[in-house]
Amino acid sequence: MIGQKAWVNIGKTEFILLLVVGILTIINVLTADGEKRTFHSPKKKNINHLTLYDCVSPEVQNSINETGRVTNFF
């Protein structure tokens, strides 16, 4: 779900907290951390490499739904 918080389990960016900013397929999502990976250059991640939390950021979700973009993270 867009705006959902995720923890990276596998890869170079292991142990980093991210936000889901887009959904590509059933398996792949676009993620951003607000520093290295911003909304304008998100990273494609396999959801099997993420731990998805039930917590969804309503600010991010509303901003993406209303304007199609996000200006700030965390």
From Swiss-Prot:
<protein>
    <recommendedName>
        <fullName>Putative ribosome-binding protein YbzG</fullName>
    </recommendedName>
</protein>
